[in-house]
Amino acid sequence: MRRHRAIPRADHILECVARAGKPLSLSDIAREIEAPVSSTHDLVDDLRACGYLTRVGAGYRLGQRLRTLRLIAGHADQPPLTPDELTELNAVIEAPVALAVLVGSDLVYLHGVGEVPAEIGAVVRDHVPRPLLATAGGRAMLAFLPADERAALLAEHASPGEAVAFGREIDEIRACGYALSDGSVQSALRVAGVPVFGGRRLLAVVVVAAPRISDRPSPALEHAARRTAVWLAARARP
């Protein structure tokens, strides 16, 4: 099924405005999303009319609609793990950790605790979307999603070969309770992704990192991943 192009463009507009740190003009927005000013104007007008954007002089910033939706959702806006809980986990396993969630078809980090290389820290701090199959956290997310959701994501965002290759990993990931990085993205680190559940519902993943010493498996990282799974199970929310 084809998505209406206006929806991803509207999402792109909101992200650009959110990241800008200052009001963006209509021409700025059109340039960022690589679209004609005329069609961008229509989308921006619709977003402003619904409260997602507001005018500030000749520019636009985020409006109050997102805030009111979060208020309406109430408890649903609570993160799967608070920063304090993530700090506690970091102290327990003595390894850097980060919390990430599924946003559309990407893994997005919410926050992290612990020392990591600057380029990796920037991905977490700036909430940079990461492809699911390129990260241990993303593969853990895929492995523990309901089968129909996983199949839909792989059909749209993976090649047939990638989908088949990942299919051979799923049982092993689910059996051990975490996914390990193959080093395709975090070359300085070895990384494990551990699922976070609320009842039977997959909420997020915790990503655990350790320095890459060699290309051989890291018993210390796997031990930290297992301890993370135990810690999460003891604090699982209903």
What are these regions (language model features)?
Residues M1-A76, V230-A234:
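N-terminal helix-turn-helix
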Residues C16, E32, L81-V92, P96-A98, ...:
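Amphipathic alpha-helical regulatory segments at dimerization interfaces
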